[in-house]
Amino acid sequence: METGSPGKRPVLPKRARLLVTAGMGMLALLLFGPRLVDIYVDWLWFGEVGFRSVWITVLLTRLAIVAAVALVVAGIVLAALLLAYRSRPFFVPDEPQRDPVAPLRSAVMRRPRLFGWGIAVTLGVVCGLIASFDWVKVQLFVHGGTFGIVDPEFGYDIGFFVFDLPFYRSVLNWLFVAVVLAFLASLLTHYLFGGLRLTTGRGMLTQAARVQLAVFAGAVVLLKAVAYWLDRYELLSSGRKEPTFTGAGYTDIHAELPAKLVLVAIAVLCAVSFFTAIFLRDLRIPAMAAALLVLSAILVGGLWPLLMEQFSVRPNAADVERPYIQRNIEATREAYRIGGDWVQYRSYPGIGTKQPRDVPVDVTTIAKVRLLDPHILSRTFTQQQQLKNFFSFAEILDIDRYRIDGELQDYIVGVREFSPKSLTGNQTDWINKHTVYTHGNGFVAAPANRVNAAARDAENISDSNSGYPIYAVSDIASLGSGRQVIPVEQPRVYYGEVIAQADPDYAIVGGAPGSAPREYDTDTSKYTYTGAGGVSIGNWFNRTVFATKVAQHKFLFSREIGSESKVLIHRDPKERVQRVAPWLTTDDNPYPVVVNGRIVWIVDAYTTLDTYPYAQRSSLEGPVTSPTGIVRQGKQVSYVRNSVKATVDAYDGTVTLFQFDRDDPVLRTWMRAFPGTVKSEDQIPDELRAHFRYPEDLFEVQRSLLAKYHVDEPREFFTTNAFWSVPSDPTNDANATQPPFYVLVGDQQSAQPSFRLASAMVGYNREFLSAYISAHSDPANYGKLTVLELPTDTLTQGPQQIQNSMISDTRVASERTLLERSNRIHYGNLLSLPIADGGVLYVEPLYTERISTSPSSSTFPQLSRVLVSVREPRTEGGVRVGYAPTLAESLDQVFGPGTGRVATXPGGDAASAPPPGAGGPAPPQGVPPPRTTQPPAAPPRGPDVPPATVAELRETLADLRAVLDRLEKAIDAAETPGG
């Protein structure tokens, strides 16, 4: 073994150097290889969907941020290290036994450049990588414009607060980080080389160390002065007065704002005092200035606003906060589009004055009453329309409308998707799972206002073939038959909500020309994908990349993969939109529609902000539960617009973004940042526009805000007396709020069917109905909100009270006992419908599901009864309840004979309903024929009574009840002591 000369470092043998190099290469590959694979796959995928420009723009923006921040941080830190090193003392006392940093100093002295550059570059790169997540702020700053609205305090355009201010704050934060790191680096370097020595009872600083540390400390304080200046503008989004209102209140404007200016001045003086240390040896002046700044921050910035809030504002809050509440009301209405330009308020009595059959609008509403609940019927769809075990429908179905033979009809719709979780046995083999079972089959719809037949026999209701949807199926089997109610030319579904539940989510499709198809299509046919979607894996490099990404060697050795093969990834419609437009927030509920013969997913997308001055903060997304069980509030926003409608083709995965709000300055900013990615509103096809729905997530935010922001007067707003609440869901034991519901109702002007999203509202901490909010989805009036306000001096029952009244009705209670012997009962969506020229009609379907003890048997809900309720005329709180197998019979019970004749009767086909009373049972597809036992005939109803006579009798009874109520109250008052 050779030894080097004394003083020289030992040299590794060649073999050892090779091993070290190989080891470092393997380590680098393990660290950076997966990320490089992801980058290359993203490059391929974004190119496939036609949005590679988005990927490149985001990547270049993040790289530019990394470079800029790394350069600034590394440069400042390196300068600090270099200055400290060059100004080190030439003589350091050689006392190793008393100098604990001597070994470290020796190591640094051997390689000073490596340590200096290494520390600076490492810190710079780490800071740059963290800062790259602020790419959204950079793009908004570079491309942001104006709103044309100024804030009420400083008079600046809103664009300054949402586009510029976040960027300035981010730049300031990173400068602050850089200077603090430089200060620490300088401090440690001076300590290491003796410029700073700590001895018993005192410390010693060289002049160079004192100057450098003072300059960096002064720079930190100077940056803090700039931060105080920017804090002034951020007060307009203050949360001090939450939950009452968001934005600067009296204390913020009269205490916090002046305090910030005072602190700016003190911080500047403090910084100057630090800079004087360059000339003065005495550090007591900077120390006293720093103490003054800290004390001022506590007293002026903290204690003074606290005292003002406690002793001046709170005792007089209703008066002193009035102008600031007014600012909050105006800003919130603008930010969420719930102001007078978008919301129409109408007084509504809450008590009907006419028979619904005599009001054209009500005739339309009753004929279109939705009886099918998309939250309940998914299992019914699956059991009756599944075809194969590996097909399934979404857990919650969707509601849409189609015009069939000139008539607008709402349908419960779903896509028969491939369900990876449903594969069993050999179906789960890799070849079968990813190359054979690749797609779903068909679009299934059912008219929402009727079922095949009424279920009458309560004792044998689960054995009857009644209460099931009437299906309109558009799939491979019906392709080209001419029998499709909703024509679909390409029923195969490769992209969907259910199909994307595989982990990992991918399918391998395609084949060489002339090769035998292998994808399952039907029991008698196979198929080869011919769509434009998918990333090519025809070459060995791409196959190796995907084999690495999903950790599956079969990509390399399977004979099923050839030169024409492609892999379909990211098959969830919502995820695809989020990836191609990362600057948008997507709605949680994509829904399928048929447009020009193709199945297309529509995804509502929002532009959002969280710094809109004075606008109330709200959550656009629901609470998020972490894996550890911690519940966190969803993303908080102060501005939201449904500015983009996105579509995803279910066959080839094509993503298209359409501008839907030309007036949104945030969308205009993003369209400048990513030109060509969003198509103009003029390019939306009329057939597609006809299926746009008002999104549920946005509506839920708006209705919760309208519960407060319908109030105009700030003092009344502060007292909360006129507030509303979103009612609890009476059909959900989890005490959740009642979800909004889509309905077809008669338009007030034309009496034609109008598709709307609606919700009842109750009084604040009460259960009586206070308002009814509906959002139009028809193209002509899309986005218009209508609010029907009920008087506060009359009592109209809310959803929870109506539910209690209906289930406590003697007829309902007695039959429920009978039904529950062999069935589970599901209460469907409780619909609130304006009707009878001022009244409110509640309709609730009741579903039963047979209880089975056999694990092999399948049960699913069927519509068994319909409950309706209306307020009793001329009474305080009285209600009428209807309960029958059909809507028509229930309506006759509450309105008298004749009203039920305008309801849609059971039966018919999916394209057209039978005339009232003409519907007979028609077995739905996939359901076995009914048993031979016939349901008992309905009991005789007796002689018909003229409707006028019935109405007179009801009015007389109502008058008698009112008299008895008043008499009972008088007796109670007389018996009460002191009364």
From Swiss-Prot:
InterPro entries xref list: UPF0182
Annotated GO CC locations: extracellular region; plasma membrane
Membrane topology: Multi-pass membrane protein
Keyword hit for Membrane: yes
Keywords, in A-Z order: Cell membrane, Membrane, Transmembrane, Transmembrane helix
Annotated transmembrane regions: 19-41, 63-85, 114-136, 174-196, 208-230, 261-280, 285-307
UniProt-annotated location(s): Cell membrane
Region described as Disordered: spans on this chain: 894-948
Pfam family, one: UPF0182
Amino acid composition bias (Pro residues), ranges on this chain: 913-946
Highest taxon above the source species: Bacteria
HAMAP family: UPF0182
Family assignment from sequence similarity: Belongs to the UPF0182 family.
Protein name as catalogued: UPF0182 protein MT0070
Organism whose genome encodes this protein: Mycobacterium tuberculosis (strain CDC 1551 / Oshkosh)
